[in-house]
Every structure is written in C-alpha cells, then in structure tokens.
A protein has these predicted regions:
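Short aromatic/hydrophobic "clamp" motif used to bind/position activated sugar donors
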Residues: 86
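Cell-envelope/extracellular polymer assembly enzymes that use nucleotide-activated donors
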Residues: 2-4, 32, 185
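Conserved nucleotide-sugar donor-binding catalytic segment
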Residues: 141-220
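Acidic helix N-cap motif at the loop->helix transition within catalytic regions
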Residues: 17, 42-51, 72, 98
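Glycine-rich, basic loop-to-helix element that forms the pyrophosphate-binding segment
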Residues: 64-81
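Flexible acidic/His/Gly-enriched loops in nucleotide-sugar-dependent glycosyltransferase catalytic domains
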Residues: 72, 100-173
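A conserved acidic beta->alpha catalytic loop
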Residues: 37-46, 66
Length: 304
C-alpha cells in the first residue's frame, strides 16, 4: 500500500514549515510527497527544500513555469501522484499526528469508500483554536441531497483512492477547463458511485486567515459581499463542469446554475427579501446555514 500526499503551494512562506513538519512527523509516514509551486515570489520553495532534504520521504517539488491558478495547480499535482491513497494538503494548516493512520484505518475497514473527508478544528493565524469540530467519530455516507445543499467538504480534509482519480481523468465526465474545483469534482463523482463519506473526527487544524475564503466562511460568514458572490459563482462553475449522464442529472445541474444566477442577482442589487424568498422556495439547492450566511453578509455590507 503506497501513500501519496499532494500539496499545491503559492507564496506560502509564513506557514509552510509548520505544515510540512506536521506531515513529516505522522505516526504512519507517507511514501511520497508531491509539492507543486505555482510561481511563488517569496521564500516558499527555499523553505520546502530546507525541510524536505532532511526527510526519508520521497519528495518531488514541481515548479510551474507559469501560474496555473489554485485548482489547476492541484489537478496537475494530483496526476503526478502514484500512491493507492492520495491525501490533499493546503500550505498553511496543521495535521494531527494520526491523520494518515486514522483515515487509512477507516478506509481499509470500509472498502466501498472512494473519497473520505474528515472533520477539522478551525484555528486563527497564530494557531489558536477558534472552533472545535464534532468528534463523535461517526462515519457518514454523504447523500446527494446533503452535498448539493451545503458542499462543505474542502480538499485539505480529503483522502481518496487513486482509482477514483484515474476514472475522473479518463471517463470524460468532468470538463477540467470549466473552472470546476478539483475537490468538488472528486467528491461529486465519488458521490455518484455511492462512495463519498465523512468521518466526524477532527484529524487536522484548518487555519483561517485573510487569504483563504473557506476559512472566513467557517468562522462565521464573509465580511465582504464580493467574496460571497465569488463563492456562489464557484458553485455554478462546478455544476457547469460536470457532463450529465442522464436527463435527471442534467436537470439537477441546470437547476444549481439557475438557482445561483438568481441568487447573485438579488445579492448584487441588495434585494434581501427577494433573495430570502427565492432561497426558501428552493431549499433543495441550499442549506439553512447558507441562508443565514447570506443574511449576515447582506446586512453587514449595508452597515459599512
């Protein structure tokens, strides 16, 4: 059994050392670490080389000649991985010591799992815990309804089987040029195969700071409307990036796009009441938590 860790980096000098040390001190070590740098202009790659040259883990540092962007950087890095199990990593988080050990144990005990997300604690820029995750250790098979309403399964908390990635690369279901997020695509296809799961156990700490959108949302909502709109547009890109295999799937994906187009329109014109009426009338596409986030962001924007 071979284990790969894939990390995409860009100007991550502030936290990269702490993240790498947490990966290279796991109770079960990875067999290879694939790091793809997207044209950093700071000391990120120097710090990576300084730390990894002392490790017994096989490290492949790829330096892009041109900037690919976050998702494409990850997509090409994943394709370079050879492990049976592929863990994704951001450049600024902290893995708990047994992350690999615990995730592999769950996947080996449940062969139908294709992609596994774990819970995570939220920390601030200084590593102080802001919010602790549910640690019930419950294993949940994610339904299509849950995934579509609130796709809260970021790549940095994921591990998946290489066979799933190979299927994604060769079956033509995903249009990688559409702007689709790599983690959303992986989870969606695993979901279609009934192999998407979440372990309600915190296996890492996710760092929330001014440069990562997901962390800001987890901390209690976006403080800028344009960031919220950017997030909603990404949901549309994700749906557009999937090639439907049936009429029902086509209807679902078109519904996601149409719902979020109107959502953005109401957002941009500060029509909060119409936004809420629209959202409550289409609860199949949005969770109550996301609606509350929309209210928070809209009202906060008006008070600025």
């Amino acid at each position: 059994m071979k284990i790969s860790v894939v990390m995409a980096v860009y100007n991550g000098e502030k936290y990269i050392e702490e993240q790498l040390m947490s990966i290279l001190s796991q109770s079960i070590m990875p067999d290879e670490l694939i790091i793809q740098d997207d044209g950093s202009s700071d000391s990120t790659t120097d710090k990576i080389q300084s730390i990894t040259e002392k490790s017994d883990v096989s490290v492949k540092l790829i330096k892009n000649k041109e900037n690919l962007g976050f998702s494409k950087n990850f997509i090409t890095a994943i394709s370079a991985a050879s492990g049976e199990y592929i863990f994704l990593s951001d450049q600024d988080d902290i893995w708990k010591k047994d992350r690999i050990k615990r995730a592999l144990s769950v996947m080996e005990d449940n062969e139908n799992i294709l992609a596994l997300s774990s819970a995570f604690d939220l920390i601030d820029e200084d590593g102080v815990v802001i919010k602790k995750a549910d640690n019930s250790k419950k294993l949940v098979n994610i339904s299509q309804k849950e995934f579509i309403k609130h796709p809260k399964f970021p790549g940095m908390a994921m591990v998946f089987k290489k066979e799933l990635w190979e299927y994604l690369q060769h079956n033509g279901k995903v249009d990688w040029e559409s702007g689709i997020a790599h983690d959303w695509a992986i989870n969606y296809v695993a979901l279609k195969k009934r192999g998407m799961y979440k372990l309600e156990e915190s296996l890492l700490c996710y760092r929330q700071h001014s440069f990562n959108t997901f962390g800001t949302a987890m901390a209690g909502g976006f403080n800028q409307k344009d960031k919220r709109i950017k997030l909603i547009k990404s949901l549309m890109d994700n749906a557009r990036g999937i090639k439907a295999e049936s009429q029902s799937e086509e209807k679902l994906l078109e519904g996601i796009v149409s719902f979020n187009e109107k959502r953005i329109n109401f957002y941009e014109h500060d029509r909060l009441l119409r936004l809420l009426l629209h959202e409550f009338a289409h609860m199949k596409y949005i969770s109550l938590r996301s609606i509350m986030g929309d209210i928070y962001t809209n009202l906060r924007g008006r008070n600025r």
